Amino acid sequence: MRKIIHVDMDCFFAAVEMRDNPALRDIPIAIGGSRERRGVISTANYPARKFGVRSAMPTGMALKLCPHLTLLPGRFDAYKEASNHIREIFSRYTSRIEPLSLDEAYLDVTDSVHCHGSATLIAQEIRQTIFNELQLTASAGVAPVKFLAKIASDMNKPNGQFVITPAEVPAFLQTLPLAKIPGVGKVSAAKLEAIGLRTCGDVQKCDLVILLKRFGKFGRILWERSQGIDERDVNSERLRKSVGVERTMAEDIHHWSECEAIIERLYPELERRLAKVKPDLLIARQGVKLKFDDFQQTTQEHVWPRLNKADLIATARKTWDERRGGRGVRLVGLHVTLLDPQMERQLVLGL
């Protein structure tokens, strides 16, 4: 049985700012773009979250909820430096590390001899070491598979951890809401609940064939996760090549204005996700995806050095006009392709 730890730093960007400027610790702060430039919030500290300020929220809305919010532009070199230090701490316990972004990672400690091989004690020691050396707090989840470790890391935030032992997995899954499973969004969760599927326990009673017929590949993943099955390895060689965000509508859309409104809502989340893995926002390409009511889909992208909403909207409009052919649209997606590390190095050297 594997021993997987998911470590997630607590409001990472904001935590670095509060560490470096103690005057910020007890006041609401957020990292993000200005209201005048229609910026969005990247992250907020817990005092700000009490007012409802959240990641990916437009800055203007955040300031309405919390007029005395202190807005900071972000110091991405400082965040990257802290992230590198955290990753070095991970490497003291295992070489099997899969970074997901600057502030979270999976660790496979199945074969680790530290702490007598106890994943629970390793997670505690890692969190304590991070605090001792960086004065930052982390939360952790421990489980025999990746998706449960990720869910567990959110159970006792901030500055806590939650352990799901192999023996506890069946009982934990019985009441686990499907919406908690990574990859099950609000629209999917609503559709599942509409047919009586709210928890993993509900899905366990379903025939896999029926789920496959109704939901395709997603149905299989849903069934496997509800049984506690997740065979994905912690991939130390993982190189993230793209970042994306998409939305499946409850009803098909037929007017460009509806599509544009969805892009306006998706863009802040794309910006937030990209900032977590690429703080300088440098990219190779950006593009859009449309899926039609006949389940055919099309993508269009082109070279662009930085994330740019106006260009994405223009690309989407061109795709809408040229490829829709009168069909309804059931899904809208935005994505960016990241720079190859070798190409990025060449670009930096050429500056």
Curated annotation (Swiss-Prot):
HAMAP family: DNApol_IV. Monomer. Binds 2 magnesium ions per subunit. It is found in: Cytoplasm. It comes from Shigella dysenteriae serotype 1 (strain Sd197). The active site is at E104. This is DNA polymerase IV. Belongs to the DNA polymerase type-Y family. It catalyses: DNA(n) + a 2'-deoxyribonucleoside 5'-triphosphate = DNA(n+1) + diphosphate. It comes from the Bacteria. Mg(2+) binds at D8, D103. Poorly processive, error-prone DNA polymerase involved in untargeted mutagenesis. Copies undamaged DNA at stalled replication forks, which arise in vivo from mismatched or misaligned primer ends. These misaligned primers can be extended by PolIV. Exhibits no 3'-5' exonuclease (proofreading) activity. May be involved in translesional synthesis, in conjunction with the beta clamp from PolIII. Signal peptide: none annotated. Its main location: cytoplasm. The record marks F13 as: Substrate discrimination. Keywords: Cytoplasm, DNA damage, DNA repair, DNA replication, DNA-binding, DNA-directed DNA polymerase, Magnesium, Metal-binding, Mutator protein, Nucleotidyltransferase, Transferase. GO terms for molecular function: damaged DNA binding; DNA-directed DNA polymerase activity; magnesium ion binding. One of its GO terms (cellular component) is cytosol. Its cofactor is Mg(2+).
